[in-house]
Design a protein with these regions (language model features):
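NAD(P)+-binding Rossmann beta1-loop-alpha1 motif at the extreme N-terminus of oxidoreductases
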Residues: 1-45
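Rossmann-like NAD(P)-binding element
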Residues: 44-96
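General beta-strand structural signal in soluble alpha/beta enzymes
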Residues: 49, 120-125, 170-172
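Rossmann-fold NAD(P)-binding glycine/threonine-rich loop
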Residues: 90-137
Length: 208
């Protein structure tokens, strides 16, 4: 798949590495194009880097790997996303990581859909710590990625993307279910940072 990743931080770098390793065509986009080019060069594996507009233009799937609060600016820079799959991986949390800033009647994913009404927004990966993106860090364990969207084809595409890098994609229903998935991400952060488990844990839905 042709994937644009907006951002050059922990998630952007981990996703770019893993996705490119699985033979996806990855372009990093940053508000500082030089930073994206430098990261792309460091990763290798055919990853390219540049500005946000150029990266988004080349791709069918655009992953926003930036803080939720930066989404409006980045989407403005991304330009026309009509018909593209837009993946929201964010946890809309406070600066101290301890609480969610959005919830109950909406979610970060729904806000992003409102900002990019012609894109097909998919919520995914918000419950996976960056440290667990490299396959070797998962030590053979199959971790679940909860995937929510109002567009079934987009959901299938992002599920295939997650599966191609060794995750178990779980259909989590419509985009409005992000109201429930984002609190799970926040609970995971509490386990990872405040309850002593470290950033090597991930939630899973278990059937008996
Ligand atoms: N880290 C995790 O384990 C984890 C797990 C699940 C989900 N998430 C979510 O993934 C997203 C990224 O997290 P991260 O840990 O990778 O963050 P990070 O390492 O702090 O990187 C954030 C990136 O966002 C960019 N950015 C910030 N403001 C921007 C703006 N106004 N316009 C364009 N780009 C902007 C930064 O660019 P500059 O370098 O130019 O400042 C940087 O590349 C967040 O929404 C987070 O909630 C993170």
């Amino acid at each position: 798949m042709k994937v644009a990743i907006i951002g050059t931080g922990n998630m952007a770098s981990g996703l770019a590495n893993t996705l490119a390793g699985a033979k996806h065509e990855v372009t990093l986009g940053s508000r500082d194009p030089g930073k994206a080019s430098a990261l792309a060069e460091k990763i290798g594996l055919g990853v390219r880097g540049g500005g946000i507009t150029a990266a988004a233009k080349l791709a069918g799937v655009v992953i926003l790997a930036i803080p939720f609060g930066a989404a409006a600016d980045a989407l403005k820079e991304a330009g026309d996303l009509a018909g593209k799959v837009l993946v929201d991986i964010s946890n809309p949390i406070s600066a101290d990581y301890k609480s969610l800033l959005i919830g109950h009647t909406t979610s970060a994913a729904e806000k992003i859909q409102a900002l990019a009404p012609k894109a097909k927004v998919v919520k995914a990966f918000n419950t996976i710590f960056a440290q667990l993106l490299p396959a070797e860090a998962r030590q053979g364990k199959s971790l679940q990625v909860f995937v929510a969207s109002n567009d079934e084809a987009a959901k299938a595409e992002v599920s295939a993307l997650a599966q191609s890098i060794g995750f178990d994609a779980l259909d989590a229903g419509p985009l409005s279910n992000s109201r429930f998935i984002e609190p799970i991400g926040e609970m995971n952060i509490h386990f990872g940072y405040f309850l002593g488990k470290g950033t090597v844990v991930a939630p899973a839905w278990v059937a008996v």
